[in-house]
Structures are given as C-alpha cells and as structure tokens.
Amino acid sequence: MVTYEVTAVVRPELADAYEAYMRRHIPELLATGWFVRASLARSTGNRYRIRYHARDQQSVDRYIAEDAPRLRADFAEHFPAGVELTREVWQTLEEWQP
C-alpha cells in the first residue's frame, strides 16, 4: 500500500470554506480510480492532513501525471492564498492489528 499524504495549514478565516471544499474535492479525486480510500483529519492550529491510499506506486505516479494538474488548478482557483500545502508519498512497510 502506498499513501499520498497532503498536509495543509489554513488561515483561520478560510477553515470553514476549506473543509467544505475538501468534502467535495476528495470524492472527485477518488473518482479518478487511482486511490482506494481517503481520510481527512484536523489538528490544532487549522492544520489538516489528507491521506489517499493507493494499491501501488504506479497508481500514484499516474494520478500525478494524468489528474493532479487539473485538480490542483481547481484548488488554486478556490484558494489562491491562505493555504500552505506539502505533499509526501509513503510506502507502507508493515501493518499490525490487534
């Protein structure tokens, strides 16, 4: 499993709009077919983490090449300022469950 993780730091006055946007954006991203599930989490200081889980690295690479430019442009149109993003790809080495 490969995780494509996006961290966002959002100005306080944009937090409600950001959350509403992400509730539409995440299903659109999942509809590309490259990811099998996603989660949205919030921490203190209007910091958010979105995790998109893919079956393999090829799926993440194809998403970045084929669909990310369009979805990122839409995000930038809605939030031209006030949201700082970082993106990372994580390779799952092992998982445990009780």
Language model: regions and residue ranges:
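Short amphipathic alpha-helical segments
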Residues: 14-37
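Serine/threonine-rich low-complexity intrinsically disordered regions
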Residues: 11-14, 72
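Residue-level signal for secondary-structure boundary sites
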Residues: 14-16, 58-60, 95
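Short amphipathic alpha-helices in soluble, non-transmembrane regions
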Residues: 20-23, 62-73
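Glycine-rich beta-strand-turn "strand-cap" elements at beta-sheet edges
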Residues: 36-49, 74-98
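Short, well-ordered beta-strand segments in beta-rich or mixed alpha/beta enzyme
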Residues: 2-9, 37-68
